[in-house]
Amino acid sequence: MQVYLFDNTLDGLLTAVFDSFFRKQQDVMLLVEGEQLPLFADEPYRVVTDSEKATRVWKGLEKHLSKDGLHMITISWLSEERALNQPLFNFICKVFRPHPLTPSPRGEGGAFGREGSLNTLLSLERNASDEDVLAVRNTCRRVLHEQLRMKQFIRFQKAKDGTYLGVVSPDHNVLPLIIDHFQDRFNDQPWLIYDAKRHYGYYYSLTPNPSLTPNPSPTGEGNFKGEGSNYKVIRVTFEDEASVPFDLSNGKMDADILSDNDQLFQDLWRTYFKAICIKERMNPKKQLSDMPRRYWKYMTEKNAT
């Protein structure tokens, strides 16, 4: 077995797929740089991320898989789970290899250019009996489930300048998946959604900024409405998080920039939350299932002033 070391990026993983075919190595263990190597392993091969190789592999996937299959890859990658690396690598490699169900003739362009049987490829991406496919599909489901929860559980605070701030810390990197939702729903007000765990966020401005240009990856990951036309959605990071005007531990905005009436609205929301609670029908177990405790620290109704 040949060990491949890569930089834990999607482009790096796609490059590893390309290199494994170029080097004609099928039995590959994919590890991230710095991970412990297995005993008695040969000298590892270090994958140098190459955007051209990654683009070529992705274009091959676009020919071989349905849109759902492509989304399964990109969405599962947002899980940031290292346990996904090997199954995802194996799954992508299987796409380009002849499948036992139906032989796929090789055409021009090598493995990444051949046209296989669509029915065969659809059978592969839906084959729950394949442990690699199942691992990728289950990971994709977990990410989509948290995406839905983020849409439900983000709580905003209003600053004096009219900007709304929402701080989150999801298990998975779901911000790129929810920005379209908030842009469609709150397109008449500026807002910032910040991921305290990953130290970045997205700012929606009412004023288009044509000087900003998107920098998409070959997979299209991270592209959403606002990029490419009006550039109202801007990815932001802070050089010094110690100076940000909000508390990363609970998402609370500093009192000196908080809108004068926002505290009143927070108190009203807590009062409403308590008022609609029917004590005789309280079900803490059900509540924890629908609203996991890990989200509470950023939710207004669960935090007193």
Predicted features, each with a name:
Residues 1-3, 164, 251-254:
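Glycine- and acidic
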Residues 13-23, 90-94, 180-184, 267-274:
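Short, hydrophobic/amphipathic alpha-helical patches that form generic packing surfaces
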Residues 31-98, 116-148:
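Charged, alpha-helical interface segments at or near domain boundaries
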Residues 99-116, 207-230:
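Intrinsic disorder/low-complexity segments
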Residues 122-206, 229-238, 242-243:
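Internal, well-folded beta-alpha domain core
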